[in-house]
Amino acid sequence: MSRYTGPLFKKSRRFGYSILETNKEFSKGRKRTYAPGQHGNKRVKLSDYGLHLYEKQKVKLVFGVSEKQLLKTYKKAVKSKEITGTVLLQLLESRLDNLVYRAGFATTRRQARQLVNHGHFTIDGKKANIPSMQIKTGTTVVLKETSRKLKLVQEALEMQPASAWVTRKDFQFTFYRVPERTEMHKDIKEALVVEFYAK
């Protein structure tokens, strides 16, 4: 299954969670903040399977990953001696596109993915254009000099502070430590995702 590229506001309403992490989907003045569809404003009780599937889909949308990518990440997390769900989130947070977003070079993960895809960043002097690339702690990512005047980057840097596990200086950032569970998404129930794949 491919990565979802459609409108995210509708998906955010479906999940009752800001996929873009801006809460614009639920801001005052928006006509519809409930789930889409004819009966969107009615609560639907999900089955046990439905709850697990629901959480998995939410994780895919938040991080912008495909089913194949999420399953691969889960299998890698299972091999760890640490808590599988926490490691799963840490691996997703360690993706290059996510770190570009966390460092404040983009206002959304989609925007960050686009910047990476277009080759605006380098690692050790080499082009880094694979969004799913797993970045090791201690790695420094640099925005190319020719990309530093991009309006969307300049606006993002003014608006977005870097996350606690990323240090940003000028046009580069360093992924200096893995985030703790308490620092990551509080609205994601990663245990349900782990249980979904474990069945």
Swiss-Prot record:
**What InterPro entries is this protein classified in?**
Ribosomal_uS4 (IPR022801), Ribosomal_uS4_bac-type (IPR005709), Ribosomal_uS4_CS (IPR018079), Ribosomal_uS4_N (IPR001912), S4_RNA-bd (IPR002942), S4_RNA-bd_sf (IPR036986)
Keyword Ribosomal protein belongs to the record: yes
Q: Tell me one GO molecular function of this protein.
A: structural constituent of ribosome
Q: Which UniProt keywords apply?
A: Ribonucleoprotein, Ribosomal protein, RNA-binding, rRNA-binding
S4 RNA-binding domain location: 94-157
The Gene Ontology CC terms held by the record are:
small ribosomal subunit
One of this protein's Pfam families, by short name? Ribosomal_S4
Q: Where is the signal peptide?
A: none
A Gene Ontology biological process noted in the UniProt record is:
translation
* Lineage top rank: taxon: Bacteria
Its biological purpose is as follows:
One of the primary rRNA binding proteins, it binds directly to 16S rRNA where it nucleates assembly of the body of the 30S subunit.
What does the similarity note say? Belongs to the universal ribosomal protein uS4 family.
Q: Which HAMAP family match?
A: Ribosomal_uS4_B
Cite the record's note on assembly: Part of the 30S ribosomal subunit. Contacts protein S5. The interaction surface between S4 and S5 is involved in control of translational fidelity.
Name of the molecule in the record: Small ribosomal subunit protein uS4
Q: Organism source for this protein?
A: Mycoplasmopsis synoviae (strain 53) (Mycoplasma synoviae)
Organismal lineage: Bacteria, Bacillati, Mycoplasmatota, Mycoplasmoidales, Metamycoplasmataceae
